[in-house]
Amino acid sequence: MVAETIAKYGRLDVLVYNSGAIWWASVAKSPMKRFQLMQRVNVEGLYGVVQACLPHFEQSDGTWRGRIIIVSPPIYSRFFRGKTAYAMGKVGMSVLTKGLAMDFQREGKSEMAVTSIWPATAVQSAATQNMAQEDAKDLRTANVFSDAVLQMIKAPVEEVNGELLLDEDFLRMKGVSDFEKYNLVEGSRPRRIMPAVFPDLRVKEQDDEGRRVDSTKLGASRL
């Protein structure tokens, strides 16, 4: 897929990872095959695509330039409830956003940004197609999501790199105030499903790395 993109367009500017597998149930009711599928699609799939794309963000002059958008949530404990197996993968995707952003900063790649996006309300998609008809009033169209993605791609690196953002909140920050146009059912008021405030994942010792270890310099890997 990446090779075909480069062959056709000669460059890569943006990666949006929107693939996903979903299974919401307790641990006892989440069989291993479901768990493994979600990890392969959500976590391994993301990691593999990012690894394949990264070299193509390097420019001919040695600088790096590009944007990566990942569909994964802010990290908070309520998200784990009733869907632990699913949450393990989606939160892992958000960890990649945080960690890769740190890589960009440490390596001086000041024109690279990776950002996670998640819906503030339920959005019309394959994941919501089985909702009861009377619940359609709580859905927004996918346009709210795509509009937010476009704004993230255009935003300054320092504004979005390493951020775990909600579509509505980011659009409001960018000056959007009319959200009725996104409602699936005219005149409805979709219920917000995400918290208003999220925990700060940083610690006082955030910049203290201790003795930094680079496994690539410790000899040949046994894998």
Give the positions of each predicted feature.
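Catalytic Tyr-X3-Lys loop
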Residues: A21, A28-Y47, I69, M93
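Short alpha-helix in the Rossmann-fold core of NAD(P)-dependent oxidoreductases
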Residues: Q39-L46, V50, R81, G89, ...
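C-terminal helical subdomain
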Residues: S116-I117, Q133-R222
